[in-house]
Amino acid sequence: MKVIFLKDVKGKGKKGEVKNVPDGYANNFLLKQGLAAEATNSSMKTLEAQKRKEEKDAAAELENAKQLKETLEKLTVELKAKSGEGGRLFGSITSKQIVDAMQKSHNIKLDKRKFEMDDAIRALGYTNVTVKLHPQVTATVKVHVSEQ
């Protein structure tokens, strides 16, 4: 019996796959558990339409990420912090503070977990911070820390 997997089934198939499985296995397990649906003409058409929609959504998401990258790479995020001798900060600048500053000054809202910082910023001056917007799109934001 041909079935369309609705969920990943270990050793049998992944979500969205169409496979031929034994009738008893399909009727007694896959269909009853809601793990698969019978592969009829209408369900095949629905699956194709769903795949096209997912591809279209993924392409739109990638395009949005590319546009956001262009915007971010033109920006400089300005932050003020107290510092001691030699330009060392009292404390540090974290990704959350960068996100808050971007929200206030440029009205761009990002998740702080998208910032790839090995360590917090601990010195005055300019620092480049990478932001992973999409698995295929990475931007660099310039952060300027000045004395308060």
From Swiss-Prot:
The GO cellular component terms are:
ribonucleoprotein complex; ribosome
The cross-references to HAMAP family, in alphabetical order and at most eight, read: Ribosomal_bL9
Stored Gene3D superfamilies: Ribosomal protein L9, C-terminal domain, Ribosomal protein L9, N-terminal domain
Please give the family membership noted in the entry: Belongs to the bacterial ribosomal protein bL9 family.
Outline what the protein does. Answer: Binds to the 23S rRNA.
- What SUPFAM superfamilies does the entry give? L9 N-domain-like, Ribosomal protein L9 C-domain
Any idea which UniProt keywords this protein has? Ribonucleoprotein, Ribosomal protein, RNA-binding, rRNA-binding
| An MF annotation (GO) of this entry | rRNA binding
* Pfam families associated with the record: Ribosomal_L9_C, Ribosomal_L9_N
Per the record, the domain of life is: Bacteria
Biological process annotations from GO: translation
Protein name in the entry: Large ribosomal subunit protein bL9
